[in-house]
Amino acid sequence: DKSYCLLKQIILDKNIDTLFCPAYEGGHQDHDVANFISFKLKSYCEVFEFPEYNFHGQVINTNTFIEINGSEVVLDLDKEQRLFKTKSMSVYKSEKQNLKYINLKQECFRPLKHYDYTSPPHDGILFYRRYSLFSWHPRVDDNSPMEICNEIINSKIFDK
């Protein structure tokens, strides 16, 4: 709720007309919550979403939406743009080993679609839960997909 209020104020104060956010895809719970907050800001500016990574179909998918609706813009990156993307990702030193699967050939975005935030982004194992059987694994997060949905549903801005 605090993040929503802060972003809303920044949008209004700075006269921001466009916002980009991660897709609701189960890649990371923070990304999914950011998508929900951005959806609630659609009345203040135009909002676009971009896919990062998901585990739909029990396969790692990058830079592609789980469901295509025809409004997607796909940008094929040239060699210079791919190099820039690689250098940009190297800023995240803590994620160096985690980002090797990212598709460097394209970027994709579309107007933010309306999701059912009361249920996980897709059936099956979400990306951030794929190692959940191994509690000792460093990439395991304790949040269940329904816990994230319940946090969204119980937020003050859910029914706004």
Locate each region found by the language model.
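Metal-dependent de-N-acetylase/amidase catalytic core
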Residues: 1-160
